[in-house]
């Protein structure tokens, strides 16, 4: 997408262009019961045959992003479990796993820093 800047409060002119944010979608669909993921990627997770435990990176930088999508709309039957791998998740330490189980759901998580960790 691109366009022209006109009629703005500071009377500026020029052009704009929108570029992708740098997230890469992994081309193969995850069907395994476990997967270790990498920041900067999007993953289609197919839980038709089994639930999937997703292990997050053991280190992260503020702004790191990962997206998961329900490829076959089956998370309600076989959900995903996120293992935060030693980092905080929504401010909670890594003593529990986070579960998502809604058909058709997608989850985008961003690393905010050590205090809150990964935040959806």
Where are the regions a protein language model picked out?
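Short edge-strand/loop segments of extracellular domains
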Residues: 83-93
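Short, charge-rich binding segments
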Residues: 57, 98-101
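Beta-strand-rich interaction surfaces with strong enrichment in secreted/lumenal proteins
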Residues: 43-45, 95-99
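Exposed extracellular interaction/assembly regions and N-terminal maturation sites
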Residues: 4-83, 114-120
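Low-complexity acidic/polar repeat-biased segments
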Residues: 100-120
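Short solvent-exposed loop/turn micro-motifs enriched in small/polar/acidic residues
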Residues: 2, 28, 91, 100-102
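Residue-level detector of beta-strand structural context in well-folded domains
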Residues: 52, 80, 96-98, 107
């Amino acid at each position: 997408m691109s366009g022209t800047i006109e009629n703005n409060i500071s009377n500026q002119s020029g052009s704009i262009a929108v570029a992708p944010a740098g997230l890469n979608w992994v081309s193969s669909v995850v069907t395994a019961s476990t997967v270790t993921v990498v920041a900067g990627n999007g993953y289609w997770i197919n839980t038709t045959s089994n639930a999937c435990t997703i292990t997050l990176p053991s280190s992260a930088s503020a702004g790191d992003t990962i997206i998961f999508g329900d490829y076959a709309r089956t998370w309600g039957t076989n959900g995903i479990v996120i293992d935060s791998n030693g980092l905080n998740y929504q401010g909670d330490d890594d003593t529990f796993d986070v579960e998502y189980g809604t058909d058709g759901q997608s989850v985008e998580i961003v690393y905010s820093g050590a205090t809150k960790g990964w935040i959806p």
